[in-house]
Amino acid sequence: MNALYNHAVKQKNQLQQELARFEKNSVTAPISLQGSISATLVSLEKTVKQYAEHLNRYKEDTNAEEIDPKFANRLATLTQDLHDFTAKFKDLKQSYNENNSRTQLFGSGASHVMDSDNPFSTSETIMNKRNVGGASANGKEGSSNGGGLPLYQGLQKEQSVFERGNAQLDYILEMGQQSFENIVEQNKILSKVQDRMSNGLRTLGVSEQTITSINKRVFKDKLVFWIALILLIIGIYYVLKWLR
């Protein structure tokens, strides 16, 4: 249980740092930061649930009437922190979306006002049409494929597509990292449980041969698990390499 609690504290500290970064740069924060916060929130929620399950199982095994106040306070604190982090991230995300919408609205409005107030805009437009007239006649097919968008708008749209793709890849990588950390942490917990079970079997008078056969079986299961994990990581690597 202490290992789970320490892991939850580590995730909580990471969330505090990421939320502080998001709050400090609420307008210019990258989308990948939001993905990282979402992944850490999911991992923390999973850890809190596992901690609660361990406490209930410990209570049933020891036939205790109530959970130790120390562990109960830890669970209550983690649950409250998770709720606060989720609410804060929701508010920051809403503020980020509102600022984005306001910036886009003011940007488009300002560009229209500048065009209408500029006395030379009409003459410049005519000159541009004269200069581009010959090229547009030769490039009708290209402009029709582009949906009539100006070149800079097309490039901006393409850049936004790439940014969204990179954000998704960063989110996938962050999820993979969190999953790997959870797997390593669970493996440590299982190793400790195995040692305790072996000591318990020796205390009960079970022969060393039986304990050795059980440990061999556990080792085979571990070997299969690690091979599957390595194959999974290799598969994720090639998928990401293909997507990039």
From Swiss-Prot:
Function: SNARE required for targeting and fusion of ER-derived transport vesicles with the Golgi complex.
Biological-process GO terms, alphabetical: endoplasmic reticulum to Golgi vesicle-mediated transport; intracellular protein transport; vesicle fusion; vesicle fusion with Golgi apparatus
Full protein name: Protein transport protein BOS1
Cytoplasmic side: 1-222
Vesicular side: 241-244
Quaternary organization: Component of a SNARE complex consisting of SED5, BOS1, BET1 and SEC22 or YKT6. Interacts with YIF1 and YIP1.
GO terms for MF: SNAP receptor activity; SNARE binding
Family designation: Belongs to the BOS1 family.
GO cellular component, one term: Golgi membrane
UniProt-annotated location(s): Golgi apparatus membrane; Endoplasmic reticulum membrane
Gene label: BOS1
Keywords of this entry: Acetylation, Endoplasmic reticulum, ER-Golgi transport, Golgi apparatus, Membrane, Protein transport, Transmembrane, Transmembrane helix, Transport
InterPro entries: GOSR2/Membrin/Bos1
Transmembrane stretches, start-end: 223-240
Membrane topology: Single-pass type IV membrane protein
Residues with PTM N-acetylmethionine: 1
